[in-house]
Swiss-Prot record:
Location within or outside the cell: Cytoplasm
HAMAP family given in the database record: RecA
SMART domains listed in its UniProt record: AAA
Alphabetical UniProt keywords: ATP-binding, Cytoplasm, DNA damage, DNA recombination, DNA repair, DNA-binding, Nucleotide-binding, SOS response
Keyword ATP-binding applies: yes
Gene: recA
InterPro entries xrefs: AAA+_ATPase, DNA_recomb/repair_RecA, DNA_recomb/repair_RecA_CS, P-loop_NTPase, RecA-like_C, RecA-like_N, RecA_ATP-bd, RecA_C_sf
Organism: Serratia marcescens
Pfam families (UniProt xref): RecA, RecA_C
Protein name as catalogued: Protein RecA
Function of the protein: Can catalyze the hydrolysis of ATP in the presence of single-stranded DNA, the ATP-dependent uptake of single-stranded DNA by duplex DNA, and the ATP-dependent hybridization of homologous single-stranded DNAs. It interacts with LexA causing its activation and leading to its autocatalytic cleavage.
PROSITE patterns to which the protein is assigned, alphabetical: RECA_1, RECA_2, RECA_3
GO molecular function, one term: ATP binding
Extent of the signal sequence: none
Binding locations of ATP: G67, P68, E69, S70, S71, G72, K73, T74
Length: 354
């Protein structure tokens, strides 16, 4: 009908105007797949890369990762650095919390000899360093840990108890305006780690909020909510955390997806466990009783042994990873989150959980 055609033309013109004014990806159809033309860096978790829809975090954009204490925020960003360094990219870590552990970073695969690190005195100094690194065009990934620790100079120089209403929010707002364009031009990924605070007097709805005002929420292309949802035990000893990440905002693909994976203490994200779980889900790995097989060859009895096989055979792990990415990303396949419920018989057969 003519009316429908006119509406379509008007809609197309409106969408074009919005994208021209606010940038590509500011509006899209929920089921639309426009993510493959965006350069990304892996998060170190296959299921999270798939949930993001583009295979990782987008270059040239601002990303916010927030969650409660000890939920895996810094671990996730260190895994991003390790993945970027494997691709030959230059990374920087702005340690505003003064809490970065180089030994732990090295265990996660970070090349600490080639990682730029700064421990700024004030929030303004941290953000100026970010801007200088971005404008150089030579740094590919910058991590700021964390927004809550970016203390304005006036607050540091003042007395404890002085009121500095909205100072940090104004500082972040100004920095976002300055950084957003430079990041796009330099194709630099900037990740802000943030903490959670509680709003006072909220009776209905979610009382949680993040620090630093609203500017970061608006300028971030991706916002990830990371939570610890359980413990992983070997006997009575806790050896890791079950982790869930929700993609609460996504400008490069459809938002609101989530991923579950395991973070092993001292090792990081259990990527091989994800390969086994997703491989079984999508029938790339056969499971008969306790035995796992790949391409007709047995790779281990129990999930722990199957993971060890993939660790000892990185070529097979890479092949399986590529097949899963091709299926779940490039063909628009749907991620089925691997959960412990599907592998209850594994828990009965072995005390080792991954």
């Amino acid at each position: 009908m003519a009316i429908d055609e006119n509406k379509q033309k008007a809609l197309a013109a409106a969408l074009g105007q919005i994208e021209k004014q606010f940038g590509k990806g500011s509006i899209m159809r929920l089921g639309e797949d426009r993510s493959m033309d965006v350069e990304t860096i892996s998060t170190g978790s296959l299921s999270l890369d798939i949930a993001l829809g583009a295979g990782g975090l987008p270059m040239g954009r601002i990303v916010e990762i927030y969650g409660p204490e000890s939920s895996g925020k810094t671990t996730l960003t260190l895994q991003v650095i390790a993945a970027a360094q494997r691709e030959g990219k230059t990374c920087a870590f702005i340690d505003a919390e003064h809490a970065l552990d180089p030994i732990y970073a090295k265990k996660l695969g970070v090349d600490i000899d080639n990682l730029l690190c700064s421990q700024p005195d004030t929030g303004e100094q941290a953000l100026e360093i970010c801007d200088a690194l971005t404008r150089s065009g030579a740094v590919d990934v910058i991590i700021v840990d964390s927004v809550a620790a970016l203390t304005p100079k006036a607050e540091i120089e003042g007395e404890i108890g002085d009121s500095h209403m909205g100072l940090a929010a104004r500082m972040m707002s100004q920095a976002m305006r300055k950084l957003a364009g430079n990041l796009k031009n330099a194709n630099t990924l900037l990740i802000f780690i943030n903490q959670i605070r509680m709003k006072i007097g909220v009776m209905f709805g979610n009382p949680e909020t993040t620090t630093g005002g609203n500017a970061l929420k608006f300028y971030a292309s991706v916002r990830l909510d990371i939570r610890r949802i359980g413990a992983i035990k070997e006997g009575d000893e806790v050896v890791g955390s079950e982790t869930r990440v929700k993609v609460v905002k996504n400008k490069i693909a459809a938002p609101f997806k989530q991923a579950e994976f395991q973070i092993m203490y001292g090792e990081g994200i259990n990527s091989r466990g994800e390969l086994v779980d997703l491989g079984v889900k999508h029938k790339m790995i056969e499971k008969a009783g306790a035995w796992y097989s790949y391409n007709g060859e047995k790779i281990g009895q129990g999930k722990a042994n199957a993971c060890n096989f993939l660790k000892e055979n990185p070529a097979i792990a890479a092949e399986l990873d590529k097949k899963l990415r091709d299926l779940l990303l490039h063909s628009g396949g749907e991620l089925v989150a691997a959960s412990g419920d599907d592998f209850e018989d594994d828990e009965a057969e072995t005390s080792e959980q991954f």
